[in-house]
Amino acid sequence: MSMGLEIAGTSLAVLGWLCTIVCCALPMWRVTAFIGSSIITAQITWEGLWMNCVVQSTGQMQCKVYDSLLALPQDLQAARALIVIAILLAVFGLLVALVGAQCTNCVQDDTAKAKITIVAGVLFLLAALLTLVPVSWSANTIIRDFYNPLVPEAQKREMGAALYVGWAASALQLLGGALLCCSCPPRDNYARTKIVYSAPRSTGPVTSTGTAYDRKDYV
C-alpha cells in the first residue's frame, strides 16, 4: 500500500470523525416544519441530541438542555448512545492508524504495520455504520410523522442540518476505512521458498575416467 493512499484514507476518516462530532453537538436534528397555518411564525424550534433551542424572529436564541432522557423520542435516545460510541471508535481507530502508519516507527515489521492499518480501517467502517444508523432512523421517523395525518401540524418537524452532516460523516468514514482496508502485507512474505538441491561433492581424487575413488581402494 502506497503512503499516499494511506494518508488519503486516514485524512478522509479523520474528516468524517470531525463531522460526526459536529453532528452530535449541533442542536438541529429536527426543525420546525413551516406548513399550514404555521408558515407565519414568530419562532423556530430546533431539537438536538442534548438540547432544544428556540429562535425568535428578532434573532434571539434560547437553548435548554433536556431535563430527562426519558423525555426524548426513542430514535434520539438511541442516537445519543450510538453517536458517542461512533466517536470513541473513530478516536481508537485514529490511534491504531498512527501506530501502523508507514511514516511512524512504532512498529518496524511491514507485515505487522499492514495488519494494524487494516484493523484501523475496520474500526472506521464500524464508526461509519454507527453514525449512519441513528441518522437514517431519525430521518425516517421525521418523514413518517410528517406524512401522518394523525400528527398535529404544530408537532411536525423537518430534517435539520445535523442529519446531512451525519450522512456526510458516514460517507467519509466509509471511504476512508475502505482505503485503509486495502492495505496488504508485502508480497515478498508470500513468495514460495525455493529449495535448491545440489549433488554431493566427493573429496577423493578424480581419475582420467572422471570417477572418484577413495584412497583405501588402493591398499
Curated annotation (Swiss-Prot):
Residues annotated with Phosphoserine modification: S198, S208
Residues spanning the membrane: 9-29, 81-101, 116-136, 160-180
Positions where Phosphotyrosine occurs in the chain: Y197
Oligomer status and interactors: Can form homo- and heteropolymers with other CLDN. Homopolymers interact with CLDN1 and CLDN2 homopolymers. Interacts in cis (within the same plasma membrane) with CLDN19. Directly interacts with TJP1/ZO-1, TJP2/ZO-2 and TJP3/ZO-3.
GO molecular function terms noted in the UniProt entry: cell-cell adhesion mediator activity; identical protein binding; structural molecule activity
PROSITE patterns given in the database record: CLAUDIN (PS01346)
Protein keywords: Cell junction, Cell membrane, Membrane, Phosphoprotein, Tight junction, Transmembrane, Transmembrane helix
GO BP: actin cytoskeleton organization; bicellular tight junction assembly; calcium-independent cell-cell adhesion via plasma membrane cell-adhesion molecules; cell adhesion; cell-cell junction maintenance; epithelial cell morphogenesis; establishment of endothelial blood-brain barrier; negative regulation of cell migration
Name used for this protein in its record: Claudin-3
Side Extracellular, residues: 30-80, 137-159
Region: Interactions with TJP1, TJP2 and TJP3, residue numbers: 218-219
Cytoplasmic side: 1-8, 102-115, 181-219
Species in which this protein is naturally found: Bos taurus (Bovine)
Family affiliation: Belongs to the claudin family.
Family annotation (InterPro entries): Claudin, Claudin3, Claudin_CS, PMP22/EMP/MP20/Claudin
